[in-house]
A protein has these predicted regions:
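ATP-dependent adenylate-forming carboxylate-activation enzymes
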Residues: 65-66, 86-99, 196-212
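A short N-terminal helical cap/helix-turn-helix that marks the beginning
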Residues: 2-26
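Conserved AMP-binding/adenylation subdomain of ANL enzymes
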Residues: 158-172, 182-212
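Flexible, low-complexity linker/hinge segments
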Residues: 3-10, 96, 110-131, 158
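Conserved AMP-binding/adenylate-forming
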Residues: 33, 49-91, 176-178
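Conserved AMP-binding A3 loop
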Residues: 36-38, 131-159
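Hydrophobic alpha-helical segments in the ANL/AMP-binding
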Residues: 14-18, 69-87, 161-163, 182-194
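Conserved AMP-binding/adenylate-forming core of the ANL superfamily
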Residues: 8, 24-55, 96, 152
Length: 212
């Protein structure tokens, strides 16, 4: 993947760097706990510090996308650290195809420590300074193809959803699709952008557990 070399030493702003200012408002709900915006920001900042410094070049971060707090923290952290995110489906075969095609510098998403050598290995790609996110197309034939999105495009899409649906800080949405689908990801983007909250759920709407 070669588009244009990023400006070394200049980390682009994260997607939701202002979220820490929302303090004790609830951002995320899981089966085990509630996480405030302040806690989510702190967890993301701590995780971001584990990624390679952007002064040595932006990396392509492959994240296995699941509706878990571990993934969400990794996702926000990778953006906050100034890197580019490639979302990977949790399905083994599909993930293997994307890894073989695009060779991310780091694969994460489950909150576990990053592999040894990540901080010292040079970047594998020249990444455009505006690039923030890569989403796989839904086509089932041919080589995997990616849709490129800038930070501006991601935020503009989230803002348009907020305005259209009238999302306000008191709203709470439950996840019904995994975040490697653009719709599933848009639920996270739109609600976190406007100070609302999300309930992280991995069950489909047809599963009895979804309604419990």
């Amino acid at each position: 993947m070669t588009v244009a070399r990023t400006h070394q030493g200049q980390a682009p702003p994260g997607l939701f760097d202002e979220s820490a200012g929302r303090g004790t408002a609830v951002a995320v709900v899981t089966d085990e706990a509630e996480y405030t915006y302040s806690a989510l920001s702190r967890m993301s900042a701590e995780r971001a510090a584990e990624y390679p410094p952007v002064t040595t070049g932006r990396r392509l971060i492959g994240l296995v996308a699941t509706n878990t707090i571990e993934f969400l923290v990794d996702y926000l952290a990778a953006h906050s650290a100034g890197h580019v995110v490639l979302l990977l489906p949790p399905d083994g075969a599909a993930t293997d195809n994307l890894l073989a095609a695009w060779h991310p510098d780091v694969v994460a998403g489950d909150g576990r420590p990053l592999p040894a050598g990540v901080l010292t290995a040079p970047p594998r790609h020249d990444l455009h300074p505006d690039l923030a996110l890569l989403l796989s197309t839904s086509g089932s034939t041919g080589a995997p193809k990616l849709v490129r999105q800038s930070r501006r495009a991601v935020l503009a899409n989230a803002r348009s959803i907020v305005d259209y649906l009238g999302i306000v800080p008191g709203d709470r949405a439950i996840t019904t699709l995994p975040p490697h689908y653009c719709y599933g990801l848009s639920v996270l983007h739109s609600h976190l952008l406007d100070g609302a909250s999300v309930v992280l759920n991995s069950d489909s709407v047809s599963a009895p557990a979804f309604w419990d």
